[in-house]
Swiss-Prot record:
Family: Belongs to the SELO family.
Gene source species: Agrobacterium fabrum (strain C58 / ATCC 33970) (Agrobacterium tumefaciens (strain C58))
Cofactor(s) listed: Mg(2+); Mn(2+)
InterPro entries recorded: SelO (IPR003846)
Active-site residues, record numbering mapped to chain: D247
Name of the protein: Protein nucleotidyltransferase YdiU
Substrates-to-products reaction catalysed: L-seryl-[protein] + ATP = 3-O-(5'-adenylyl)-L-seryl-[protein] + diphosphate; L-threonyl-[protein] + ATP = 3-O-(5'-adenylyl)-L-threonyl-[protein] + diphosphate; L-tyrosyl-[protein] + ATP = O-(5'-adenylyl)-L-tyrosyl-[protein] + diphosphate; L-histidyl-[protein] + UTP = N(tele)-(5'-uridylyl)-L-histidyl-[protein] + diphosphate
Amino acid sequence: MMKFDNSYAHLPERFSAAVLPTPVKAPRLIAFNRTLAEELLLDVADLDDDRLAAIFSGNVVPQGAEPLAMAYAGHQFGGFVPQLGDGRAILLGEVIDVNGRRRDIQLKGSGPTPFSRRGDGRAALGPVLREYIVSEAMFALGIPATRALAAVLSGDRVQREVGLPGGVFTRVAASHIRVGTFQFFAAREDDEAIRSLADYVIDRHYPDAKNTENPYLALLRGIAERQCALIARWMMVGFIHGVMNTDNMAVSGETIDFGPCAFLDEYHPNKVFSSIDAQGRYAYNNQPGIAQWNIARLAECLLPLLDPEVEKAAELANAVLADFAAAFPQRWLTGMREKLGLTTEEEGDMDLIQSLLSLMQASEADFTLTFRRLSHAANGDAEPFRGMFIDIAGADAFLTRWRERAGREGISDSERSAAMLSINPAIIPRNHRIEELIEAAVEDGDFEPFHAMLTAIATPFEERPDNFVYMQPPMSHERVFRTFCGT
C-alpha cells in the first residue's frame, strides 16, 4: 500500500523514539485526498473507507512503516524549552513521490509518545478539520505548506475544557525537521548530532549546498532565503500563523502547524487572533521580524559548523541575518506591486501602496475583498472597490494615482486585470466559515459544510455562483476574534 523508504528512522537513536500508534475505538473516514495519494504513489485504489480509516487512524500499521516520535526543543513565545518533541504525532515513515521527492507521512492525534508531557496524545476533531482545510487552501494558493492526506473520526472522546469528539489527521510534509530540532541538540552541546542533522538536511533539502565552499553556511542561507520567501507569501494573503515558535518553523520552507492560525478579515497591521498570544508577539506585521529572530536561533546552533573561530562564525551568521533583513522588504514590495498589477518598479510605489493600506485600515476594509475588487477596477469596474471605503474621496484619489502609475507601463487594462485576478484570491478559508463547519461537525455530526468548503478553497481564484458565499466577509455577528490551538 505504501512503499516506504525510511531515512530519519535510521539516524542515531537520540533523534527520535520508536512508538506505535494507540488504537482508537471506532474509526470513521471523514476525508481522503486521493489526488495527493496518487502523487505519493500510494496503492489505495482497492481499499474501501473502512480499511482507509483503520490505516489512517493508526489502528493498522502499514507494512514497512517504522513509527517514531521526533525529538526537538524550541523557543515558545520567546522562552526556551529544552525538550518538546512529538507529543501527539507519530511519523509512520517516508515515501518517494511521483516527482522523486522524499515525503513524510505522519499521524497527528494517534496517541501518547515519550514526548507527551502528561498529555493524552490525542487531537480533538475541530483542529483536525481546521488543519485539513487550511493546509489544502495554502496549497491551492500556491504557498508552500504541509498537505492533508486524511481525516478520521476516532470514535473516542477527548477531554479538553469539555469532552469533544476525537480525530486523527494524516499530514504529508517535505520533512518535519524544525529549527527546534537543531536546538534540541545544541542545548545538550551535542555537536556531533548537530553535524549529523545538518548533513541530513543538506542531503534532503539543500543538495546544492554540498558543492559550496562552506556547505553549512550555504545551508543557513538557504533556510533563511526560503523563510523570507514564505513569510512574504503569507503577508500577501493576510495569513497569520499565530504561533511562530521555533519548533513550528520547518527547515524545508513549508508552512507547518496551523493550530490557532487565521486570515485577516478587515485590514489591521497588528492583528492577533491566537488566544495564547496575549502580548501580540506573533501579530500579522510582526511575522517577518519573528522569522528573522527564529533564523538567528538556528544560526546559534550552527555556529560550531560555520567556522572554528567563534568570532568568524558569528560574522558569517550575522551576514545571513542582515541579508534577510534587507531582502524581506524587497520581497514584500515586489509582492504588493503584483497585487496592484504593476510590472515595473518606480520610486513612488511604496508610498502608493501605503496610501492604500492606510485607507483600508481607516475603513476597516476587508483585506482579500479589497484587492479582488481592485483587480476588477483595473478593467473599469471601480464601484465595488469604492464601496469598500468610508473615505470615498480618498479612494478616488488613490484610484487616480494608481491608474496614472499603471498607465505608464504600456499593457492593456484587460491584461492587467487578468494578471491581478490570478494572484488576488476570491476565496480564502474565512475564519467564520471554518468555525461554522467545525460547529456543524462537532455538535451535529454534519460534515457537509466541511466538504463544501474543501471544494470551494480548491479553486481560490474562481468566482462562481456556487462559491459566492465563501467570498463574503463576516457580518458583525459572525466575526471571529479569537482562535485556539486545540492541544
